[in-house]
C-alpha cells in the first residue's frame, strides 16, 4: 500500500515532473481547460531535490502556451537546462531561471487546413544528443551543442516517449508498439560506459 504524504493543488492539470541536477522540476497548466485543443499558458517550477518541499519553489516561470493541452508534455533536466515538450510549438530549452536558450520545431509545422501536423510529446537528453518523440513526425535526434538534426525517423504511428540506453533508442508509439533504433553515421552517444 501507499501512504499519501503530500498533495499540492494546482490551478490546472499537472503535466509532468522530472529530477536532475539536484532539482525537482514540475510543469502545470495555469488554469483548467475549456477544451482539449485550447492553448493554455503553463508554469515551470524548480525545487531543491534535497529539501523535497514542493510548496516553496526556488524559481518559477511561465511557459507561453501548451497546445493542445491534453498532450504528453514531457519535461527533462540535464546540465542545468530544462527541456519542455510544448506540443505544437515543439521542444523549448530554458536555463534554471526560465530564460529561453533555444528551441526546435519541425519544418513547416502547419498543414493546408491550418492544423499542426505533429506534436513534440516526449524527450530524452543524453550527453551528446537530444532525442524528441515528435508525434506523427517521428523520432528526431538533435546535436546538443549545435541543435542541428542528426537523424530523423518517421514511421506510421505517433511517437510519444523516448529514452536512450547504451546506444539503443527506445520509442513508445501510441498504438501498441515499442520500437528500438540505433544511431548510425554519427558519433555514438556518450551517456553510458562501454
Model-derived segments and their meaning:
Residues 41-48:
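Beta-propeller blade signature
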Residues 11-21, 67-78, 114-124, 157-166:
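Repeated scaffold domains used in trafficking and secretory/extracellular systems
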Residues 3-9, 56-66, 100-114, 148-153, ...:
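A short beta-strand motif characteristic of beta-propeller blades
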Residues 1-3, 48-53, 95-99, 143-147, ...:
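Short loop/turn segments that connect beta-strands within beta-propeller blades
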Residues 24-26, 81-84, 129-132, 168-171:
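Conserved beta-propeller blade signature
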Amino acid at each position: 500500500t501507499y501512504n499519501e504524504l503530500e498533495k499540492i493543488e494546482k490551478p490546472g492539470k499537472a503535466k509532468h515532473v522530472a529530477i536532475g541536477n539536484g532539482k525537482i522540476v514540475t510543469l502545470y497548466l495555469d488554469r483548467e481547460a475549456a477544451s482539449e485543443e485550447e492553448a493554455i499558458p503553463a508554469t515551470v517550477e524548480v525545487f531543491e531535490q534535497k529539501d523535497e518541499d514542493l510548496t516553496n519553489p526556488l524559481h518559477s516561470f511561465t511557459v507561453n502556451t501548451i497546445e493542445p493541452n491534453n498532450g504528453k508534455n514531457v519535461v527533462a533536466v540535464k546540465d542545468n537546462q530544462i527541456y519542455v515538450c510544448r506540443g505544437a510549438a515543439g521542444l523549448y530549452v530554458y536555463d534554471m531561471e526560465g530564460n529561453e536558450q533555444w528551441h526546435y520545431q519541425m519544418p513547416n509545422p502547419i498543414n493546408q487546413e491550418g492544423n499542426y501536423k505533429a506534436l513534440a510529446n516526449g524527450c530524452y537528453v543524453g550527453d551528446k544528443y537530444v532525442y524528441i518523440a515528435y508525434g506523427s513526425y517521428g523520432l528526431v535526434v538533435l546535436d546538443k551543442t549545435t541543435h542541428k538534426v542528426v537523424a530523423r525517423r518517421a514511421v506510421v504511428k505517433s511517437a510519444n516517449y523516448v529514452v536512450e540506453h547504451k546506444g539503443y533508442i527506445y520509442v513508445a508509439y501510441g498504438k501498441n508498439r515499442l520500437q528500438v533504433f540505433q544511431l548510425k553515421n554519427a558519433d555514438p552517444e556518450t551517456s553510458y560506459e562501454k
